[in-house]
């Protein structure tokens, strides 16, 4: 279960269509910025899958990379069930359910391309960025989708 949660967590991180590929997360981005980059990228995933994977991988915590990597394996995971449910999503909304100085949990409601709604919890940790002593927000966990009875 922990492995599946960590895997799902990593798959959900990406950037918007106008954003450049993120090789290293930026300390200037707050957790909400990162969450929006991720979900906007998922919304436009099919327009540039390689870029989305690069960004998702870039915002993943090192512990998650160890479990889901290498990046080529991770890329295949993203387009497989149940992880592909977020690809090309239509809309999303979110709220903070837990927050302290180093962790934040978001409950994210997603309208999938299939017109079904589901909720996931996305968890970030403020931690040392790789190749830097600066702090940045990285994905440490994502829950499996919990679907609603009906969509639109």
Predicted feature locations:
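Short, aromatic-enriched amphipathic alpha-helices that serve as compact interaction elements
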Residues: 28-47, 55, 59
């Amino acid at each position: 279960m922990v492995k599946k949660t960590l895997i799902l967590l990593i798959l959900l991180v990406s950037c918007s269509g106008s954003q450049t590929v993120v090789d290293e997360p930026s300390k200037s981005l707050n957790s909400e910025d990162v969450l929006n980059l991720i979900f906007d990228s998922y919304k436009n995933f099919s327009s540039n899958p390689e870029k989305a994977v690069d960004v998702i991988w870039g915002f993943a915590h090192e512990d998650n990379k160890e479990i889901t990597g290498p990046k080529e394996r991770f890329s295949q995971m993203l387009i497989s069930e149940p992880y592909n449910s977020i690809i090309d999503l239509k809309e999303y909304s979110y709220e903070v359910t837990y927050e302290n100085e180093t962790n934040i949990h978001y409950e994210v409601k997603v309208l999938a391309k299939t017109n079904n709604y589901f909720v996931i919890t996305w968890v970030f940790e403020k931690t040392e960025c790789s190749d830097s002593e600066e702090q940045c927000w990285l994905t440490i966990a994502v829950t499996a989708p919990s679907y609603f009875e009906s969509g639109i």
